[in-house]
């Protein structure tokens, strides 16, 4: 079997738009750093993917009372979110673990883009990356997978990237930038797997 590489997955294929979501609102978050690294990797060596970082910090808390027109209308920030989600070919979640779960800000975005009369997430590929303590944020990632079942998201299963951020060698600098070369290569493999899976799903829909 031919190994999955940038050349085998991207040759003569359209560029896929990856809507990327950071579950942390902190400016120097490791998870923001992971999204920046993903952007750099796609620009450098994965021409078939383009990262679109979606800022969720300005969303109001999910509240059906803010919906209008029988679930067709939303506040402007929510409409913008839903447009970005609908326009995406696949998703990347940089998701920290808070109390064994996902962050309130990420869950809020998931709820807004699945509310009303249309679930905007449905039937597309997704990947999760996380960083944390001994479990690397894995427990929060597993909870996100559970939420994704109802949203009809199709998560890649391998490779997984749960970074033990406090273990040597250092993985991030003080600004949250990913500085560890091995971890960067692991992130690249996640992106290649997401790319290949998203293309397979698109081909299945066309067939």
Which sequence ranges carry the predicted segments?
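A generic structural motif
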Residues: 43-52, 154
